[in-house]
Amino acid sequence: DAGVDSLFGGAGNDTLIGLAAGMDGDGPSDTDTADFLNGGGGDDLIIAGQDDVVHGGSGADQLVLGEWITQAASIIDFEPEEDSLLFIWDDSNAQSEPPDVVVQADPENEGQLQVWMGDQIVAQVSGPSQLDMADISLISLSSAKALELVQPFASPGAQ
């Protein structure tokens, strides 16, 4: 349900979705408020929405973010040796080009990094992470659809 939710994956490989409203036109949207998404143990797929707090837990987790985020998600335990970040951008317009993705130190919060996608901060990463651009993959929405990566957007919640 939409609202402030806490989703816990527990042991095993889980899919956690922090989006409400699913697909909007050709791409994912998020009308939900902040959620807490904790993958627990296992290799999890966590799709973050706006203002969500993401804790992957142990295992090799894949964190998915994108242009649907209007308030930065907070990632509190990203481990670049194990985890991966995947950013989806909307290429439905013929003139669309991949947005610039930039990682920089947060000037207001020591020890935190900001991840910018175009002119929007989509993630705040805290902790001892040494996140850099090599840890981020960028994929178009059409490619994500072809790979069925956007299928989980149709049913918010834990799976």
PLM regions: where:
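GD-rich hexapeptide-repeat beta-solenoids
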Residues: 13, 20, 91-105
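Low-complexity acidic/polar repeat-biased segments
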Residues: 104-159
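Short, surface-exposed beta-strand-loop junctions and turns on beta-sheet-rich folds
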Residues: 54, 71, 92-94, 121-123
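Short beta-strand elements of solenoid repeat domains
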Residues: 1-2, 6-11, 15-18, 24-29, ...
